Design a protein with these regions (language model features):
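Short, structured protein-protein interaction patches enriched in aromatics and acidic/basic residues
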Residues: 242-255
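A conserved acidic, glycine/proline-rich C-terminal tail/linker
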Residues: 256-278
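One-carbon transfer enzymes
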Residues: 1-240, 246, 275, 279-280, ...
């Protein structure tokens, strides 16, 4: 396989995918990634450096002037190298048209949600799928365009979102599926033996999420709160609430009970604290057991939004 391939990535799943492809004798000629300072500047959740992998396999890295690849130096880089194929491996920005036009074959994008594209385009689909309590995820590989996840679909696979999953475990599953599908797809694309499935139907879009969106609304069922917390736990900034104007980060929780009731207590009130430090919060329906958190809590205190 003599084609020149570049991977754009800056997350753990991208690192894992790249190493897997190399071990399966897929030659990656260049990496486009971010350094730690750039990742902080552009608020990249789940950032992972490609530097060790670059040194291990002697693959050069280009650190762009812009995460959006919209600076002259970035275009110059792609024009100079004239890659055949670009693969995304954890790159949370659209690739500009002038970059895509430098590619001889094209670019492979990766996107997923609980529905087939064009449903579920946009930002943070893993988080939104968990928040919405979905029980499946469809990872789709598509031919990149400058638009938002609107290229022809090249391949896809459905997997479960079970009741124990968090955003991290869903990303583990994405990593497994992404590796397998890319290994199958790359040789077909190089040989021009791939099928394209146009997207049909009315698109829907997920909006961007920010750290401020992690504020907990306790006036919900314990099941809804569980979904919310597991959707934005590590490696994301996490769910949070306030006690006496102090922010408390909540990383892990689960529904406690619907039959042990706390009718005399207010919604958001801490109704139990156990010797382990775990505590129970009264919810609109049921109660929530919090088992991993940052901060100090006190019995009978009430969380505020």
């Amino acid at each position: 396989m003599n084609s020149k391939i570049v991977m754009c990535g800056c997350t753990e799943s991208g690192v894992e995918t790249l190493e897997f492809l190399i071990e399966q004798n897929i030659t990656i000629n260049y990496i486009v990634s971010l350094d730690e300072e750039q990742a902080k500047k552009w608020n990249v959740s789940g950032y992972c450096s490609f530097e060790k992998l670059s040194k291990k396999y002697n693959i050069p890295i280009y650190y762009p002037e812009s995460y959006s690849l919209n600076q002259k130096e970035d275009l110059d880089f792609f024009q100079h190298h004239s890659f055949d194929l670009l693969i995304l491996g954890g790159w949370q920005r659209l690739i500009p048209d002038n970059i895509l036009s430098t590619l001889k074959i094209g670019g492979i994008g990766v996107h997923g949600s609980s529905e087939m594209l064009p449903k579920g385009r946009g930002r943070s689909p893993v988080n939104w799928s968990l928040i919405e309590g979905k029980n499946r995820y469809i990872l789709q590989l598509f031919l990149m365009t400058p638009g938002i996840d609107d290229g022809d679909i090249l391949d896809f696979q459905t997997f479960d979102i079970n009741k124990w999953d968090t955003c991290r475990t869903v990303y583990y599953k994405i990593s497994v599926v992404q590796k397998r599908k890319l290994l199958e797809l790359i040789p077909k694309i190089i040989k021009n033996e791939f099928k394209r499935i146009p997207q049909t139907g009315e698109p829907t879009f997920y909006p961007k999420r920010t750290p401020d969106d992690g504020l907990i609304n306790w006036n919900q069922t314990s099941e809804k709160l569980y979904d919310f917390i597991r959707a934005i736990t590590k490696p994301y900034p996490g769910a949070f609430s306030y006690l006496d104007n102090k922010k408390i980060k909540i990383w892990k929780a689960q529904p406690f009970d619907n039959k042990i009731t706390y009718d005399q207590n207010k919604v958001g009130q801490i109704v139990e604290i156990f010797s382990s430090g775990d505590f129970v919060v009264n919810c609109y329906t049921g109660s929530l057991l919090v088992t991993e958190y940052d901060g100090t809590v006190s019995l009978s205190k009430i969380f505020t939004s």
